[in-house]
Amino acid sequence: MARINPLEKVRNIGIAAHIDAGKTTTTERILFYSGIIHKIGEVHEGTAVTDWMDQERERGITITAAAISTSWKDYQINIIDTPGHVDFTIEVERSMRVLDGVIAVFCSVGGVQPQSETVWRQADRYKVPRIAFINKMDRTGANFYRVHEQMRDRLRANAIAIQLPIGSENDFKGIVDLVRKRAYMYNNDQGTDIEETDIPADLQDQVEEYYTKLVEAVAETDDDLMSKYFDGEPLTEEEIRSALRKGTIAGTIVPVLCGSAFKNKGVQLMLDAVVDYLPAPTEVPPIQGTLPNGDAIERRADDNEPLAALAFKIMADPYGRLTFVRVYSGVLKKGSYVLNATKNKKERISRLVLMKADDRQDVEELRAGDLGAALGLKDTLTGDTITDEGAPVILESLFIPEPVISVAVEPKTKNDMDKLSKALQSLSEEDPTFRVNVDPETNQTVIAGMGELHLEILVDRMLREFKVEANVGAPQVAYRETIRKPVTNVEGKFIRQSGGKGQYGHVVINLEPGEPGTGFEFVSKIVGGVVPKEYIGPAEQGMKESCESGILAGYPLIDVKATLVHGSYHDVDSSEMAFKIAGSMALKEAVLKASPVLLEPMMKVEVEVPEDYIGNVIGDLISRRGQIESQSTEQGLAKVASKVPLATMFGYATDIRSKTQGRGIFTMEFSHYEEVPRSVAETIIAKSKGNA
């Protein structure tokens, strides 16, 4: 089957922003104007096409990244609508991993919010080119120029306006296109009657100022244009457009557009900008991968290269288990056998579908540059690489943050017991930030995630989709343990002689604090075979397993580096099990001597309230052991940035509403782990041992 769209005419884009910037509404308008839907759905009415889970339609927020294929002016556009709530950061993260370009949506009133910064950092991590759409220009308090400056100041983006609004708030009636130097006036509510006119006289000076900035920015992308600019020659529209494209794809320019998706203004011009400035799969660097022998390799966006695809999302579905994939090279065919190179397992593709939110279109194949979903992949999880059997390669996987909050769940009846384990398995396959553990002592099932809303929605899905009734415990903080000082030559010796074959394992280790985020590191410096090679692995495994439960309060031990320096063995009595136990004993003994401490997750909390309430809010954050980092006031609104322990933040959404008469908003995301103050740590440790 031949390719329908040439690769140069494919755009894989995401729509990303902070909550309430209008991402889902923007997506709906794109689908309306590109002919996928014939009636516009609204988020606040619960009818948006991309918000298709019950919870999304009820809450008016986008939880999972819905993938949709559409077209505009002979270009195939694959869109992922991502959530703006920080509890669903993994959805944004995995979308960024598979996209070639992003539309970053900002609210013209709220401007650059904390979550905007998080999304921007994620796009930076994957070097995704982006254009910005300053939305809600019809709202009271809308200010395009303020948000444009915030992008430059807070995001350190080279934000270059390529449009200017004509009017704002209730008087927002059109857009100036700086590249064409033309004005577009909207004459009806549907945004379909657009009149192209000269630029209004009262905007001429402002247009000249921003046009000059645009020309200066594009001239810097090309030596020939720079010479032309310095010689005082005007740049042509085509030269400006071409240089803007070059700068956007290189990540040195972010074109800034404006409009009101809700009022149907500016969306078609934004689609033109997607086609004009965001890259085709052939214009982004080839994907990096690793061969089975460890050598690095690249795969180019080309149908004739061997297959390389990344699974970026798993979803339980009435049709079966859907695996969303981005095909980077080659062709993925229905009915074919493929290799999951990450797990070295052969799998069969039974069906391939293109997504129109919760509607599916069966296809025979997905080609390089395509986003789609496969059915039939039983063992494939998020982050796995799918390849041809004869040309295995492992692509760089996703960055998956650790969960910071957990709750215990218990089935209400015996009948719910089996259903609960199936539901938890299915949900954890879909969402790698959702973890399930069974406490070996209490046999209690504990689920962990990225925040209260995250777990609340997952418990809600267990009831709706899997019909599981469950009791949910109070939220628990994911504490960790670590050490503060290095220790050397700590022994772990396991000897058991009771007639017949005995047991003998003996190791000597050094233990030191590791770099933050490294977890457990192991190095062997054994020389001369004092510990045979076959026993070094088991000794390491024993230490690693020992880290699962720290000595202070049973929380996982992190950021430690163990070095095996010496040991001994017995020709007859030594075994892998004996060295595993000896490794575990050595690590526990070393931790005892290395000043163990308890760590707690610190959250980056940003609060926005009318300035009358700021004193109360700051006092409350300090009472929660918070550290105030910055404070600013703008147009009667005060913003406070702080770091606060997660343990003190449960129920904060309710508290801030009552303290500000419902007018305060906040965002919270994980920042880092920090040592718990001694008095607080003593209480936590006592509680863990049943003494409190």
Swiss-Prot record:
**Primary localisation category:** cytoplasm
A GO MF annotation of the entry reads: translation elongation factor activity
Domain of life of the source: Bacteria
Subcellular location, record wording: Cytoplasm
Q: Which InterPro entries does this entry report, sorted A to Z?
A: EFG_II (IPR041095), EFG_III (IPR009022), EFG_III/V (IPR035647), EFG_IV (IPR047872), EFG_V (IPR035649), EFG_V-like (IPR000640), EFTu-like_2 (IPR004161), G_TR_CS (IPR031157)
Residues involved in GTP binding: 17-24, 81-85, 135-138
Which SUPFAM superfamilies does this one have? EF-G C-terminal domain-like, P-loop containing nucleoside triphosphate hydrolases, Ribosomal protein S5 domain 2-like, Translation proteins
Q: Which residues does the UniProt record annotate as the domain tr-type G?
A: 8-282
Q: Which GO terms describe its cellular component?
A: cytoplasm
Its GO biological process annotations read: ribosome disassembly
* Keywords attached to this entry: Cytoplasm, Elongation factor, GTP-binding, Nucleotide-binding, Protein biosynthesis
- Specify one Pfam family: GTP_EFTU_D2
Q: Does the keyword Transmembrane apply?
A: no
- Do you know which NCBIfam families this protein is assigned to? EF-G (TIGR00484), PRK12740.1-3 (NF009379), PRK12740.1-5 (NF009381), small_GTP (TIGR00231)
Recorded family membership: Belongs to the TRAFAC class translation factor GTPase superfamily. Classic translation factor GTPase family. EF-G/EF-2 subfamily.
Q: What does this protein do?
A: Catalyzes the GTP-dependent ribosomal translocation step during translation elongation. During this step, the ribosome changes from the pre-translocational (PRE) to the post-translocational (POST) state as the newly formed A-site-bound peptidyl-tRNA and P-site-bound deacylated tRNA move to the P and E sites, respectively. Catalyzes the coordinated movement of the two tRNA molecules, the mRNA and conformational changes in the ribosome.
Write the protein's name: Elongation factor G
Name the source organism.
Nostoc sp. (strain PCC 7120 / SAG 25.82 / UTEX 2576)
What taxonomic classification does the UniProt entry list for its organism?
Bacteria, Bacillati, Cyanobacteriota, Cyanophyceae, Nostocales
